[in-house]
Structures are given as structure tokens and as C-alpha cells.
Curated annotation (Swiss-Prot):
<keyword id="KW-0687">Ribonucleoprotein</keyword>
<comment type="subunit">
    <text>Part of the 30S ribosomal subunit. Contacts proteins S8 and S17. May interact with IF1 in the 30S initiation complex.</text>
</comment>
<keyword id="KW-0694">RNA-binding</keyword>
<dbReference type="GO" id="GO:0000049">
    <property type="term" value="F:tRNA binding"/>
</dbReference>
<feature type="region of interest" description="Disordered">
    <location>
        <begin position="8"/>
        <end position="28"/>
    </location>
</feature>
<comment type="function">
    <text>With S4 and S5 plays an important role in translational accuracy.</text>
</comment>
<dbReference type="InterPro" id="IPR005679">
    <property type="entry name" value="Ribosomal_uS12_bac"/>
</dbReference>
<feature type="modified residue" description="3-methylthioaspartic acid">
    <location>
        <position position="89"/>
    </location>
</feature>
<protein>
    <recommendedName>
        <fullName>Small ribosomal subunit protein uS12</fullName>
    </recommendedName>
</protein>
<keyword id="KW-0689">Ribosomal protein</keyword>
<keyword id="KW-0820">tRNA-binding</keyword>
<dbReference type="GO" id="GO:0015935">
    <property type="term" value="C:small ribosomal subunit"/>
</dbReference>
<dbReference type="GO" id="GO:0019843">
    <property type="term" value="F:rRNA binding"/>
</dbReference>
<dbReference type="InterPro" id="IPR012340">
    <property type="entry name" value="NA-bd_OB-fold"/>
</dbReference>
<dbReference type="Pfam" id="PF00164">
    <property type="entry name" value="Ribosom_S12_S23"/>
</dbReference>
<keyword id="KW-0699">rRNA-binding</keyword>
<feature type="compositionally biased region" description="Basic and acidic residues">
    <location>
        <begin position="10"/>
        <end position="19"/>
    </location>
</feature>
Length: 124
């Protein structure tokens, strides 16, 4: 425990917060081009084929981003928008592709939570 005199002499050091999404460079979203679209398997105890894409961003980074929702239309050279947000059971995947923007179509026949998947309101 420092004395008040010691604190006057040199103040406490601020700890720098490390960002969880460095490729975004403090922006809410970033645009990028898919370099590879593939499936990968999650960590134990889960089992699935998760859809992911390798994306080259305008910030110069190349990152792995998750493609949420059922079915997608992405392929190599698709232009996508990514946001932060990791996928807990896929190591190294720290970004999500935003559905319904640029070349990414929204999820078809989606009725609940539509805004998260870029789906339009269904006709009554």
C-alpha cells in the first residue's frame, strides 16, 4: 500500500484494455472480400459443421468470420460486412458476417429475430 506522498510523486499506472476485435480498428463494422468459404468442426463436446469464411478486410487484416443462420449464398470474391463477436465453440473465430448487407443475402423463411438475419417481413 503506497503512502499519499508516494502517490503524489507518481500516480497509479492506468492498465490498457486489450481489444477483442483488433481487425476492426475501433470501427463498428468493416467491409471485406471472402477469400475462402468452408465448414469447420467445433470444440468438444459439440458436434456440427459450422459455416465460416476467410475474409480480407479493408483494414488489411485477414480474419475468419462466422456465417450465421441457415443456408447462405457466399462464395469466393463475395463482398461482405463483418462485425465483432466471437463464436464460443470455434477457436480463432472472433467475427460475424452481417446477413442482408452487400453480397450476403438474408436468411430465407426466417420468422423470429429477423433483424439479426437480414430477413424481410413475411407477407401475411
Amino acid at each position: 500500500m503506497p503512502t499519499i506522498q508516494q502517490l503524489i510523486r507518481s500516480a497509479r499506472e492506468k492498465t490498457d484494455k486489450k481489444t477483442k476485435s483488433p481487425a476492426l480498428k475501433s470501427c463498428p463494422q468493416r467491409r471485406g472480400v471472402c477469400t475462402r468459404v468452408y465448414t469447420t468442426t467445433p470444440k468438444k463436446p459439440n458436434s456440427a459443421l459450422r459455416k465460416v469464411a476467410r475474409v480480407r478486410l479493408t483494414s488489411g487484416f485477414e480474419v475468419t468470420a462466422y456465417i450465421p443462420g441457415i443456408g447462405h449464398n457466399l462464395q469466393e470474391h463475395s463482398v461482405v460486412m463483418i462485425r465483432g463477436g466471437r463464436v464460443k465453440d470455434l477457436p480463432g473465430v472472433r467475427y460475424h458476417i452481417i446477413r442482408g448487407t452487400l453480397d450476403t443475402a438474408g436468411v430465407k423463411d426466417r420468422r423470429n429475430g429477423r433483424s439479426k438475419y437480414g430477413a424481410k417481413r413475411p407477407k401475411a
